[in-house]
């Protein structure tokens, strides 16, 4: 897919896109990503930006703690003189977890650091016809370790993005996977219908019902609002 954050491997661009893509669809992120970079084209500009500017640029994406942590990460990067180029250093940045650190490390610095999300877990569990619950922490660790050992030297970024693309477009979460188009179909142990039951998911918990009272303060045609910080 032609995605704006794949046109270069600038660490700031990759970090921004990965943070935006958390909890947000790809199509929705495109315009926000371009607008954000137009306003704050460098990590230094992000580090120095006013909070109101950040919140306005993020308006509509939700989960505002993401952009606040993104700025804290930018400030840490500027303070140390540049992006860390190792997995531990990337993980130490505010708001950066294993997936984001893996994406930045492999795409930008050619590190064998897997970026394992739901898409990658689905691809890998189907390849092996694995019937362990996809939510099991041990499964994620096992898959992360197996992928790290398989990363091709000099092509770590390509490998990460290929896995992302495979899970997003070929071996997707909804409906039948496009097995004829899959480049690893010959290795897949779930292609003959077993994919329907893989990945294995735990039983859904019953929804909790809450009853709350909401007070609205009105004076004529105006309503009192309290800004959430």
What do the PLM-derived regions correspond to, one by one?
Residues 1-180, 184-194:
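Catalytic cores of DNA base-excision repair glycosylases
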Residues 196-229:
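N-terminal strand-loop-strand
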